[in-house]
Every structure is written in C-alpha cells, then in structure tokens.
Amino acid sequence: MVQVNGNYLKLKAGYLFPEIGRRVKAFSSANPDAALIRLGIGDVTEPLPLACREAMKTAIDAMGTAEGFHGYGPEQGYGWLREAIAKNDFQARGCDISAEEIFVSDGSKCDSSNILDILGEGNKVAVTDPVYPVYVDSNVMAGRTGEAGEIGRYAGLTYLPISADNGFAALIPSEPVDLIYLCFPNNPTGAVATREQLQAWVNYARANGALILFDAAYEAFIQDPELPRSIFEIEGARDCAIEFRSFSKNAGFTGTRCAFTVVPKGLKGKAANGEAVELWGLWNRRQSTKFNGVSYIIQRGAEAVYSEAGQAEVKALVSFYMENAAIIRRELTAAGLTVYGGEHAPYVWIKTPEGMDSWGFFDHLLNKANVVGTPGSGFGAAGECYFRLSAFNSRANVDEAMARIKAL
C-alpha cells in the first residue's frame, strides 16, 4: 500500500475556516429560516472595478482572433504587467525594485506556501501568535515542525506572541532564527508596523542571516501616508526579504485570482556546503517547473488596476470597506466591547466578553445574533479570548449585524 505524507497527519483537526463552515452548516440545517450575516472569512463582496472588467472583455475578444490569441504565457507573468507593478507599487514609493524581480501568480496564499520549496528543511522558523494559519500549516506539511502540543503550538517553531499588552508588536527574537513571517497590515489583528519597527526586523535579519517573508496583502488599506506599505521601503531589505502581494482585497480579485511575489536579485541563501546561492534563480526555476502562469485575460484585468480609472475605482473600493470597518469599531465600542484594528486594515480584532472564550463567543454570536465571525484562538494560542470581524460585506449587512450584536 502506498505511503502518505506523514507530515499531514500532524495537522490539527481542521483548518480554521473549514471548521467555521462545519459549525455554520450545522446551525443552518437546524435553523433553515435564520438570515445569517457572514463577517468571518475575508472574502470581498463588491463587484470588480469597471476598468478591470472592460480590460478583460477586450482581452477575451482578442483571444477570438488569430492576431490576438495567446496560448501559454511566461510563467513569471507578462512583461507589461510586471512593469506596471514595479513602476506603480514600488518605484513610485522609492523602492529599488525592477520588473524582472516581480513574479505574477494566482494567489499570495499559494506563494507564501510554495516559497518553502526553495528553502532548506533545517531552517528555524518564527511566526507571530496569533498568525494567519497558512504560514504554520504549510511548514507542518513541509516537515519543518514536530507535533502540536496541548495549546496547539508545534514543536520546532518559534512563536512570537502579540497582544494588547505589547501593542500587537512582536518582540525581536532573543535567539537566532532563519525564517521570519511578518504580515502588515496584520491579519488577524489589524495592526500596522512603523518604519522604525520594520527597520529593527531588517537589522535583525541582516545580522543573523535570516530571511523575512513579508505579507503585504492588505497594504492598500493603510490610511496614513507616512506608514510603510512595503518592506522594500526599509533600508537593507533587499538583502533579507521577499514580499507577497495580491489583487484580491484591493481590487476584488478573490474569484479572479492574481497576485505577485517580489524576489530581489542578489538576495542569497546558502547551500549545504556553505556556498551562497541567489534565491531569485531558485524561485524562477521553481515557477518554471511547477506553474503555468496566470491567464492572459486575468493579467490584462490586473494591468487595468494601474490605469487612471482603475486607480480611482480601487481607491473607492478600499474606502468603502474601511468605512465598514469604522462602523464596526464604533458600534462595538458603543456596545461596551474592547476593539482593536480596523483603522489601517479591513479587520477588527475584538476582546471577547469576560468569561467567554473565542469559540464560545463564536457560538454566542451565531446562535443569538446569527452573525458569523472568526474565533481568535483559530489563529493561535495567543488569540484566545479575541475575535475577528471582517469589513468585507455590504453596508446594509454591516449595519444589520451591528444592530443585532448591540441588541444582545
């Protein structure tokens, strides 16, 4: 009989969001008339920007002609999209990033997991707690951890707790680590990092030969122009960081699928014999072997994000969701709850009421208010007694959800 990958057997009972789905399904089966409002999974709800839709329609029509047909595209992405990304997202903010260092993909979740393909199994990994579960689970699947302990933490990982007590800013590790996952604006807490905080991480990484895996999927939601949107705004980051970005949340591409990863040329790791190896070449080889590229039609839609009309429409989308976040913050505060986040991110991080843990609060809101959120403990042990609500929904649903919660 064929053997399975035993690392998958280390995974806890279920990925957070499928477990939420299971509980919601059971509730809906027992209460078929309940009008659920879902503020849990961070999926967007508003239509794709018109500029993106029109660009994709034009691309579809072109595909119907001999002259405009496109088959397999470059695994790294079409040059015109990579140029637009480099110019608008990085060079415009003073970052020394070229188009050749941009790798277009179908999702930052995929990239933040697949990057492990080019990194050695012996690397010591650090993650914040709470943390986006994919960072942890992908390392478990790749064999970089031991078993999970009683509170769900895996042996072999270095956990960096973040909470209200430390301003949701993880302390620099006291011991050397090799891989550091950072996400700002943060999922799930909604916290942001200052230039000084990111500079400290870059300094640590350079001093210890570590690699920062920087998830900037929510950078478009930052409201303060003085806050950094990219790790590459920080001096020295080209020597120690890879950045993941996505069109999912700013432009509504969750169902359309387009993202990108930035791997600077000159960024190096070491081989088993100690020889320095450029990570750009390894990632390029990995993508060329395991990835067929994002469709031409979708990439034309992503390119339109950088048009004048696209920029205006994306800005309006982001503003809409941030207004939702402001409503959630205001109404929950008025209801007597302690809330964080929601100012530079589409997530509001809530302290659960006294005597109620994360899943208890989940069940309370589900059963009493018919509102679905995300238990903080699902993001890690330090997320216990916290709860995440997402601003990704219609205004009517957000208003109704807040009215229901305030009525409890």
Curated annotation (Swiss-Prot):
Keywords: Aminotransferase, Pyridoxal phosphate, Transferase. Substrate binds at Y15, G42, K109, Y132, N187, N292, R388. Pyridoxal 5'-phosphate binds at Y72, S108, K109, Y132, N187, Y218, S246, F247, S248, R257, N292. The keyword Isomerase does not apply. It catalyses: (2S,6S)-2,6-diaminopimelate + 2-oxoglutarate = (S)-2,3,4,5-tetrahydrodipicolinate + L-glutamate + H2O + H(+). The modification N6-(pyridoxal phosphate)lysine is found at K249. CDD domains: AAT_like. Pathway: Amino-acid biosynthesis; L-lysine biosynthesis via DAP pathway; LL-2,6-diaminopimelate from (S)-tetrahydrodipicolinate (aminotransferase route): step 1/1. Its EC number is 2.6.1.83. Belongs to the class-I pyridoxal-phosphate-dependent aminotransferase family. LL-diaminopimelate aminotransferase subfamily. HAMAP family: DapL_aminotrans_1 (MF_01642). This is LL-diaminopimelate aminotransferase. It comes from Synechococcus sp. (strain CC9605). The gene is dapL.
